[in-house]
Amino acid sequence: MAEVNGCQLPEDRLYYINPDKNAFIWAKEEDGVFTIGLTSVAAAMAGRLVAYTPKKVGKAVKKDKSVATIESGKWVGPVPSPFDGEIVEVNEALKGNPALVNDDPYGQGWIAKVKPANPEEAKSVLVDANKAAELLQPIVQEKGVKCG
């Protein structure tokens, strides 16, 4: 497992890291659909989540556009999609307990499931855990992010 300042990045998934878009997203493919969520780094930066407002199932999303809005005591913002696609499922459990994103970002705290418009293009923007750790290192240092 890759790690940055105590923030884990499981190697069984891919990552979309784009600081300009505030995108620190993981993605895991199953049967042509990607489950996406916040990395532990993003969850730590946001703070304890108090609200989760997903877009509607069936909605088309563009790369870097919101699949959901999340809110903590210190931050409100979008969860960007790593690629163009369609939202096929949202995590209903987060509506009642958004802090699952903080407690279990790579499990029960997933954000949405997105079917990419172009699967090959989707995979081309994602990186493995080691590359994600490399990209996240300067951000974690600059912002003083710690996990665990």
UniProtKB/Swiss-Prot annotation:
Q: How does it assemble?
A: The glycine cleavage system is composed of four proteins: P, T, L and H.
Q: Which gene encodes it?
A: gcvH5
The record's free-text note on cofactor binding: Binds 1 lipoyl cofactor covalently.
| Listed name of the protein | Glycine cleavage system H protein 5
**Protein's GO biological process:** glycine decarboxylation via glycine cleavage system
Instruction: List the NCBIfam families.
Output: PRK01202.1
Q: What does this protein do?
A: The glycine cleavage system catalyzes the degradation of glycine. The H protein shuttles the methylamine group of glycine from the P protein to the T protein.
Where N6-lipoyllysine occurs, residue numbers? K74
Q: What species is this protein from?
A: Aquifex aeolicus (strain VF5)
Give the InterPro entries listed for this entry: 2-oxoA_DH_lipoyl-BS, Biotin_lipoyl, GCV_H, GCV_H/Fam206, Single_hybrid_motif
Any idea where the Lipoyl-binding domain is?
33-115
**Which keywords belong to this entry?**
Lipoyl
Against HAMAP family, the record matches this protein to: GcvH (MF_00272)
State any GO CC term: cytosol
What's this protein's family per the entry? Belongs to the GcvH family.
Q: Which cofactors does this gene product need?
A: (R)-lipoate
